[in-house]
Amino acid sequence: MKAQELREKSVEELNTELLNLLREQFNLRMQAASGQLQQTHLLKQVRRNVARVKTLLTEKAGV
C-alpha cells in the first residue's frame, strides 16, 4: 500500500482501513503461532501499513 494512495482517503476511510489491517494482523499472528503461516514477511508488511495509516490519521487530526 502506497502512502500516496492513503493520503487521498478521508479520515473515515482511513479508520476503516486501520480496522481491516488490525484484523488482518491478528489473523496473521494466530496463523504464525499455530505454525500455519508460510509467508512470514506479511507480518512486517501489515505492521508497517498500520503505522502508515496511524501516521496519516495523526497528520489529518492536526496534532
Swiss-Prot record:
GO terms for cellular component: cytosolic large ribosomal subunit. It comes from the Bacteria. InterPro entries: Ribosomal_protein_uL29, Ribosomal_uL29, Ribosomal_uL29_CS, Ribosomal_uL29_sf. It comes from Serratia proteamaculans (strain 568). One of its GO terms (molecular function) is structural constituent of ribosome. Belongs to the universal ribosomal protein uL29 family. HAMAP family: Ribosomal_uL29. This is Large ribosomal subunit protein uL29. The keyword Iron-sulfur does not apply. Signal peptide: none annotated. Keywords: Ribonucleoprotein, Ribosomal protein. Gene3D superfamilies: 6.10.140.1970. One of its GO terms (biological process) is translation.
